[in-house]
Amino acid sequence: MRAAASMNSLARKIGVANPHQFALHFDALTGMNTQSSGKWRSSFNGEKALSTQQLQLLSRIDPEVFKRHEMGPANLWQAMWAPLQGLRSILSTELALWPTLEVLVAEFEGDLLLAEAYHEPLTIAHLAKAVALHRLVHELNARIIPVGIDGEGTYRAIRRCLDDTSVAAALASLGIFDDVDAELSDWLAGHEELASTPAAARWNALASRLDWIA
């Protein structure tokens, strides 16, 4: 996933549409001959990881490529795979805004429910935050110390983001929708009922936690 997202993101950045065009642009910039060898094709397809050497070469196009490759689009890789302490930066605005994790989780879910009600599109950033909150709540409860939050709504939040057409299109444009959907669907396995809870039921569940719900 990392390779496909990085390569497709770079292709978009320089305005090319496929691995062949990318190689031609890269070769013109660097004086190398990667087009004839098909050097980048398998990474575009997500079949082969990018090596450190390849990332160093790609940094000639985008100096931020190492960071983007590690963090992912809208910090999605960090949300999915970083240690728990790495999740704070994804949620820094929300952690500063809300007094407790319970309120933060409720406010985030409320925002998603409002977007759903008004047919507003979601983004990969919404998905990354949903994943980060899900991990934070459930891993704290399971591994460190119970935080007194059931986290039921986080299953639906992830599913809602994955099912959003704008999120799906954005992930597909990077060549990673199928892989991201498959991995996160595995996270939801066994909790499909929670992931598909009707919106009205979640509004009712949040009513006692959010004073703006009439």
For each of these PLM feature ranges, what is it?
Residues 1-29:
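A short, Lys/Arg-rich alpha-helix, primarily the initiator
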Residues 27-53:
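Recognition helix of helix-turn-helix/homeodomain-like DNA-binding domains
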Residues 48-73:
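DNA major-groove recognition helix of helix-turn-helix/homeodomain DNA-binding modules
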Residues 50, 147-151, 176:
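Helix-start/N-cap signature of alpha-helical segments
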Residues 74-157:
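Helix-turn-helix/homeodomain-like alpha-helical modules used for DNA recognition
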Residues 152-190:
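Glycine-rich, aromatic-bearing surface loops/beta-hairpins
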Residues 184-214:
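Charge-dense, extended regions
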